[in-house]
Amino acid sequence: MDPQQRAIAEEFDQYKESYDDAVNRAIAFSGQKVEAFTRAKAHDLVRTIASHFASPSKLSVLDVGCGIGNYHPFLAPVVGSVSGVDVSSACIAKAQERNPTVSYSVYDGDRLPYQDHQFDVSFCICVIHHVPPNRWPEFANEMRRVTRPGGLIVVYEHNPKHPLTRKVVRDCEFDRDAVLLTMAQTRDLLAKAGCSDVATNSILTLPPVGGFIDKLDRFFANLPFGSQYRAVGRVTAG
């Protein structure tokens, strides 16, 4: 593991028990807890997968940069299998403790420890902004390598144009060195990695309070006002 990746891994090792607390401090002004945002994105991911595949229950899904596995209790019941990988061995140990049915691996931040075309869907949630920018193309290329042709790559990221998002990133202890990507940058990253039909949509334009408000939030998907966004690309053959 090179020094940059080791520094990232060591930083997140420190937050294996206090990750949620650190995020909650940063978003306290919103009146919401991290669980609400996690649930909203997990449900969005499940809807996204279901809209592209007829039988989600047969799919193999990989979470790249999975941390402590916050999204896996929502995902595991609706897909065939979930795997998670992260550079932080401490976070992976915590994730395995919380989600014993999920398969976890630690990696060095370079080559993912999986075979070519192993997964139907690969996703990452608010991960790329922790990756050094010179490694963004390599990160996307690895997600593409392990995803089968016709499969999906799904990326969730912070919207750097949203003022409250910038405040959260500034106030979050482990986001202080983050470099945020615009929607256009993420679209370009996936396209250059070998994805077609790359689409980006806003999410979390409204607070994730559930019910009607969550449904209403989807009507704003085509406007660039969400605090975060989703990028989806179909992996091409070759």
Where are these regions (language model features)?
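Conserved class I S-adenosyl-L-methionine
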Residues: 1-55
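Class I SAM-dependent methyltransferase SAM/SAH-binding core
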Residues: 62, 68-111
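A conserved beta-strand element that flanks and buttresses the S-adenosyl-L-methionine
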Residues: 123
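A short glycine-rich, Lys/Arg-flanked "PGG" loop and its adjoining helix->strand segment in the class I
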Residues: 137-149
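Conserved beta-strand signature within the Rossmann-like core of class I S-adenosyl-L-methionine
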Residues: 150-157
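Short, glycine-/aromatic-enriched active-site segment of Class I SAM-dependent methyltransferases
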Residues: 159-176
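Short alpha-helix
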Residues: 179-194, 200
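Core SAM-dependent methyltransferase catalytic element
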Residues: 213-238
